[in-house]
Amino acid sequence: MDIVKIICAILLPPLGVFLQVGIGKDFWINLLLTIFGLYILGLVHAIWVIARER
């Protein structure tokens, strides 16, 4: 299941975070990082959240 979340995070980082933790602090941080043109930071944050919440 983590592979699916990581693939979702690569395509759309907030989706990967949402699938892992739902709508919370990490989701909103990731959404802001992704929206403001910092896709790579959003991606790194999403992978970190997915790996951390195992």
UniProtKB/Swiss-Prot annotation:
Cellular compartment(s): Cell membrane
Transmembrane segments: 3-23, 31-51
InterPro entries per UniProt: PMP3 (IPR000612)
Pfam families named in the record: Pmp3
Keywords linked to the UniProt accession: Cell membrane, Membrane, Transmembrane, Transmembrane helix
Signal peptide (UniProt feature, chain positions): none
Membrane topology (UniProt): Multi-pass membrane protein
Cellular-component GO terms for this entry: plasma membrane
Family according to the record: Belongs to the UPF0057 (PMP3) family.
Protein name: UPF0057 membrane protein ssr1169
